[in-house]
């Protein structure tokens, strides 16, 4: 039996390549300790790059000041939609996803200490305006060590 394949079938098999954004990432965890990742997919407007990356790199610096965080940012470089960026926050288990309300305020406070009192609100607004209206979403990724290569530090 011969069946035609639609564009959806081709799209499902599409390979997308990403480059690690070292200056927008911070991770002081031992490689392999984090098994759960909250991954945010962002679609950055063509002219939104400067505001997007300013906020992401500053968040990484604030995360470093707070410590005990795993934050990785990957920018789409080939094969996917223009402006596709992944932002991942790692934790040992699902409790790390639940305590986001404890961790994020600490990052916000460190951001303000580093860059000025109104910096977080202003930069976050510019960041939000740098994103396409549609296509942003989040996922939970689970790392299975028994099915994976040995862990290594990314940066």
Where are these regions (language model features)?
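Solvent-exposed coil/turn segments that connect beta secondary-structure elements
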Residues: 20-22, 47, 92
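Short, surface-exposed ligand-recognition loops at beta-strand->loop->(often short) alpha-helix junctions
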Residues: 44-53
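Short, well-ordered beta-strand segments in beta-rich or mixed alpha/beta enzyme
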Residues: 4, 32, 36-43, 75-108, ...
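Short, glycine- and small/hydrophobic-rich beta-strand elements in well-ordered beta-sheets
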Residues: 17-21, 60-88, 98, 117-125
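A cross-kingdom marker for long, charged
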Residues: 86-87, 95-96, 101-155
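Short, structured interface segments
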Residues: 9-27
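Single conserved hydrophobic/aromatic residue that forms the stacking wall/gate
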Residues: 1-11
């Amino acid at each position: 039996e011969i069946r035609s394949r639609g564009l959806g079938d081709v799209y499902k098999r599409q390979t997308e390549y990403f480059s690690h954004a070292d200056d927008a990432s911070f991770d002081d965890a031992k490689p392999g300790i984090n098994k759960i990742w909250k991954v945010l997919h962002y679609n950055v407007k063509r002219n939104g790059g400067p505001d997007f990356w300013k906020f992401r790199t500053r968040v990484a610096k604030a995360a470093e000041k707070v410590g005990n965080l795993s934050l990785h940012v990957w920018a789409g470089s080939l094969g996917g939609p223009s402006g596709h960026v992944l932002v991942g926050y790692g934790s040992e288990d699902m409790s790390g996803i639940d305590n986001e309300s404890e961790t994020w305020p600490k990052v916000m406070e460190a951001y303000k200490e580093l860059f000025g009192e109104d910096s977080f609100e202003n930069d976050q607004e510019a960041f939000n305006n740098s994103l396409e209206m549609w296509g942003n979403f989040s996922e939970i990724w689970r790392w299975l060590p028994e099915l994976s290569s040995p862990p290594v530090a990314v940066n």
